Amino acid sequence: MKRILTLAVAALFVQSCSTETETSQVNEKILTPPIAKKIPHKMEIHGDVRIDDYYWMRDDTRTDPEILAHLQAEEDYAQQQMAHTKDFQKTLYEEMIGRLKKDDTSVPFIDNGYSYQSKFIPGSEYPVYVRTKDEAGAKEEVLLDVNKMAEGLEYYAVGDWSITANNKIIGYSEDTLSRRVYTIKFKNLETGEMLADQITGTNGQVIWANDSKSMYYLAKDPQTLLGYQVYRHVLGTDQSSDELMYEETDNSFYTYLYKTLDSQYVGIYHSSTVSLGVSMLDANDASAKFSLAHPIEADLEYEAYPYGDEFYIKTNYKAANYRIVKASKETLADKDKWQDVVAHSDDTFISGILVLKDKLVYTMRTKGLMSMAMLDYKSGQAETVQFDESLYSVDFEKNVDFNAKQVRVSYVSMTTPSSVFDINLADMSKTLLKQVEVVGGYDASQYTSKRIMVKSRDGVDIPVSILYKNDSFKQDGTNPVLQYAYGSYGSTNDPYFASHLLSLIDRGFVYVHAHIRGSQMLGRKWYDDGKLLNKINTFNDFVDVSRFLVAEKYVHQDKLFAYGGSAGGLLMGAIINQSPELYRGVIAAVPFVDVVTTMLDESIPLTTNEFDEWGNPKEKKYYDYMLSYSPYDQVEAKDYPNLLVTTGLHDSQVQYFEPMKWVAKLRDMKTDDNELMFHVNMGAGHGGASGRYKRYIDRAFTYAFMFDLLEQAKE
């Protein structure tokens, strides 16, 4: 657990001592920025030599005393530098958790004769999963009390849980280290007893066959952490006797399991950056083997969903923005025989698909704006679902019944809290089942969200979403701005409501979400124009939006802050190398910053899967291009803005040593006196702390960092 409010250096920040001796004693306790030793490590490829003075910081065992001591010294220094904001952090934290409903419950869903729900008990960090038989007078059963399961552990997460078709056994997965490597356990719901079966080293998915005694799981490679082996496990047997059903030998592919909505098939997704396909087997046949629906091909993506003797398929075949087609069992393996259901459009990007008995429902994006449509199988006509706002996000919620007469969706906008609707398939009427309550009162009419387009340096219009409070927004340069973006992997982050942002917005901040190239906000081309040898567009777009905000007096650069995490942390590293003068402060969360070295090392998790995203630096053209923007390699002796960098020791996605090395190099080379803090969570991974409330400790720390630079970290 992070040490935010209990600081070893708290004595430094008491009232000034009255005597010279007392002052001297206090000053002796003041920590200076940790300076790391240098051990030159030579790396040579393509005739180019790089010297990495901090390569020694990598320790895959995470046990080296010197490395751990240096990380702790960084954390101690960060806490010291923020100690004077302790009370303000507490105020922010209490604000944030105060907006959360303490006894919150999820919308129940009916599955196989039971109603399922999760609940938060006041004061608890974790949910309790319960079910009730779908009949009058039935008593509630506790499936998993995650609070009890997490007792005594610094980190705990349930990855997945699933119940057998006979409703008697629950399988669930748990991670106690934050490396996203899960152990699957089983519990008899009739007796409450745990079964002896345990399956270690998995990606966490629990997929049952229909016989209620066998299940499928995905084993991870212990070094690369890639899921690559699919096994069938039979209850009552040891993991060592499990049957290997599939092994992925191409380490550029991700592998995932799923079960179709009609429960007829167990499937495998085979996914790389440029390919997607599926294998399936009959969930009713214990001897069944997986077979490909269609051969895997480079640059071909397809997902197949059964509908009786046919399949509905979302594909990019002859459709950059995707189309929906159908095929029979006989024609499924021949893409040239697939028949159009929803044709390709240059203007509309199809993002999601749900095949129900009565309607085919799909989500799409037109000029960056989300919508949802329902298609009638008989007529072939589709009708768009109407929502009140123009700037929103809609996606499928948990839909478990193929025969359902309604589709359950989640809806959110920058000013509307997350809401769950059931939409009637017959007349498209909407029933609001729940909207997340903002405790303490929230009036959406006091806030404005809008979408503007910003012209990039190469003439492209960049969508930008903006949120502010009406009575504090001036557009005269006096409002502070937090600008966020991600822009990688084709991941499209739509505008959303986050109650913690109110702690910024209500104090005058403007929140700006730049939908830069590298996502699929404006279709597949928007992604292609922000990857591989076009990656610089991602960074340029962010900087161009920043310059627009300054030019149009949304903000003065003395009040402009930037935030990005993971691949968005790479973005932060690139923009401060390109335009450090633009930003008062930058938050780089778990940042991917040592791009070239990581992508040259195939033993590091995720490397081989991402050659089609960044390029393979073993090819000179990619090496040269990646080197030109790699934040770690491009650190120079110059002024940088104030920086807050974060990591988790057990991060499985971006290893701790990347930001650790980056901070050390920045400390050594930067010429300014601006703040550089490295906030280290010694007990967490890529997603930060586990638990409902703990995450807000870090959020309060981050927000206090910005307010402190504005000299507003006081109440």
What are these model-predicted stretches?
Residues V14-S16:
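C-terminal motif of bacterial Sec signal peptides marking the signal peptidase cleavage site
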Residues S18-E20:
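Bacterial signal peptide processing site
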Residues P65-S162, S173, F253-P306, S351-G352, ...:
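Non-catalytic accessory segments flanking enzyme active sites
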Residues S115, I170, M215, V266, ...:
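Hydrophobic beta-strand positions that form the internal "hydrophobic ladder"
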Residues F120-P127, A150-Y155, E174-T183, Q198-N203, ...:
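A flexible loop/linker signature enriched in serine peptidases of the S9 family
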Residues V130-K133, K185-N188, Q229-T237, M280-A283, ...:
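Beta-propeller blade signature
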Residues N147-W161, Y172-R179, E193-L195, I423-S429, ...:
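Cap/lid segment of the alpha/beta-hydrolase catalytic domain
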Residues H513-E715:
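Active-site-proximal cap/loop segments of hydrolase catalytic domains
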